[in-house]
Amino acid sequence: MAERVQSERQSSHPTSFTGNHPHLEKIHQKLHHAKVEIVHFKHSIGKLGNIVNPNHRHDEEHEQEVDRKRSEIAESHRFESFAPIREGHLAKFYIDGRDYFWALATALESAKEVIYIADWWLSPELFLRRPPAYSENDRVDTILKRRAEAGVKIYIIVYKEVEAALTCNSQHTKHALHELCPKGSPGHGNIRVMRHPDHNVFDRGGDMTFYWAHHEKYCVIDHELAFIGGLDICFGRWDLKQHPLADVHPETVRNEIWPGQDYNNNRIMDFQNVEDWKQNQLSKTEYGRMPWHDVALAIRGRSVLDIAQHFVETWNHAKRDKYKRDGRYDWLQLEWAEDDILGVQHPRFPVGDYIKHPLHPLNKEKMEKLGKVTTQLVRSSADWSHGILTEHSIQNAYQEVIRNAKHYVYIENQFFITATGEKQKPIINTIGAAIVDAITTAHSENRKFRVIVIIPLVPGFAGDLRDKGANGTRAIMDYQYKSMFRGEHSICGILKGKGIDPVKYISFFSLRSYDRLNRTERIEKKEERTGVKYEDVQHAQAHEVMSEEGVTGGHGYGKDESVQYHMQKDREAFEKDQKEDKPHDKETKDSIAQDALKSSRRPSEEGFQGDEELEKENIVTEQCYIHAKVLIADDKIAIIGSSNLNDRSQLGYHDSELSIVIEDQNTVDAKMDGEDFKASYFAAHLRRQLWREHLGLLPPQDLDASGDPNATLPGEGDYDFQEDERSRIVEDPLNDELWDTWNRQAHDNTNIFRELFHCIPDNAVKTFEDYDKFLPKEEIKAGHLFNPEMPLKEVKKKLDGIRGHLVRFPTEFLIDEEMAERGLDFNEITESIYT
């Protein structure tokens, strides 16, 4: 049991007065209760005054004293972070969802006392291992339910979205998780979920925050192990290194990988009604999913306690701001930190208990000697998100690491919006200035130096970029272009003004994937014979695997047994029908995405059970959505976390973020521009594995990671880098042969995708008139072949030429147009939302 530290509560009455008068005692208790209610009501009303006093958490003497203490702590640390540099860690990186979620499932199952989870979005129905039909015990809610029933205390903070703008439905998350252990059942009360911030001051008296989000993604287990990175525990994130687009399985829908809402393409359609997680309005037989590329890591060591402290500070801030008079939510205390630093309050009449963590004695000395990885937590936090003065140590870390780089800076990020100075308003963060400084210094020293940036081709929001509704998306793209290479104040513009050729020093790339939907003649014949549509069979399968007994459907979302019965009957009838009009001697794979990696086959060698026209209809492409937030410099240092490269993530007082700086004291003998070099094991191998994936030098992944050391926890086995002679080309990041290969593959892949699909955005589209001419005909579905008349043999031969997923970022897209029009949705008041 947790140590419950009871606060001092005012005695309800003198013992000598009531001891022999039970009737008077009851009256006095009622009067005392009424007094408490009046005090609470008075304070609730008093909070309305905060509307006109945005500094209300920092204007009293005791609050200013706490601010002073926090500032002194931060000023004594590198990057002015709340956390110091700490040594002696074990660390493990995870690239893409399979490895990360596999390891997370292992860790959650091992929890004995306490779990902290912070997410922008959390889907209780998410399967951490695949395929779901064979991994029924590996769903998030089933794991958390088991741990809660075993006595583990689970604390979760999720972003409370503005419902008009986002569809993640945190209310469903909260109610679904709270109802896992109803009153009277084992584990009741062991799962507590907070939603923050509020958007209505009259709701619970909390501050109103409309524009900014809790964007962190991290998990702490028993104060011994932590996960941190770019992956929310939610739909749409689970993926493999080959980044498949297809999930159609003629043999049996039990082989489906992404059931229900988990199959998503944000460029075509945003998530819809996620509380009805079994359904999906995006047809798997017509459209490919949007693959998801991400990076995270797990650590053991002293910095785990810093992540725990960040969580507890956020929890107590939300408790004070929103749940102060809700007895279901306790104040959290930590053994190693003072209450005032943690934001713990001791009101006269407290509601909820005071719980001190961890529940077991800490051996800090042992935690500091586990390995040789040095780490430091950095964050973006401020008054609205954390109850503190603004901290932007993530931006400080980015700037310092970039300026100190001697050989290269490699960035993967969801966005790239930054300024080189004060002349790019409304953009404020100056990471761009640090990039200019690093390149300028290298140029003056005649030193080879490269900045390589990989970002999505287009932000992951639904809609045709020509539509008025896409004005916000175009605004983001416009800010990115003006940060990178458009205008005299962009990074490239500043460099040109200094007489420096930017092409020599900085390059921008993206990722794209292809696949073939496995809608075969066999499926069509089955539909004819049974009268059951394949989409209905998929819905039935999703209903079966996502509606296990003992797992609640959440707030108001119970199961309809009659509907379920008929759905399962249809599915059984469809799958029992094994008749064939004619035998097929061709093997048809459910996905051919693996052919872009180190595979034994190429697309031209793939068989298909159907005619050529049907196969052509099934060939699709989509951008591989880069959601990673990674910076690596000189094979020495890495920054990984939740922070995008834009104002929202970097300023501190907009979105809240948490990232970690990694420096591994384990070194490897390496090369840098042909010279002998001592590289950091962690940073060098993270970069190499990312580049091998992007260049197609890795083999595809299986769904099952049970024997893969890349999906284990820190300290439980080394990586398997699957190296061969060809893949070693990435070892020297400044190798000219590598750079030639990188650019050639990006160029070739870009041209092939352009010829086959006419993908938007593209350098051939400089005006909206070009856009109209370039786009496929209206009857061509999004992501399908541009020219249906091209012979199949020619299509597949061209696909053979695609290696990996690397493509060039289109620097000239709509260069002759004003991309963002000022109006109601985009103006001086709202423009900071898009930066």
Residue ranges and their predicted role:
Residues L24-I27, H58-D59, D67-E75, F82-I85:
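N-terminal alpha-helical scaffolding segments that mark the starts
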Residues P456, H654-S656, I662-N666, A670-K671:
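Compact beta-rich and alpha/beta scaffold cores in large eukaryotic transport/transcription complexes
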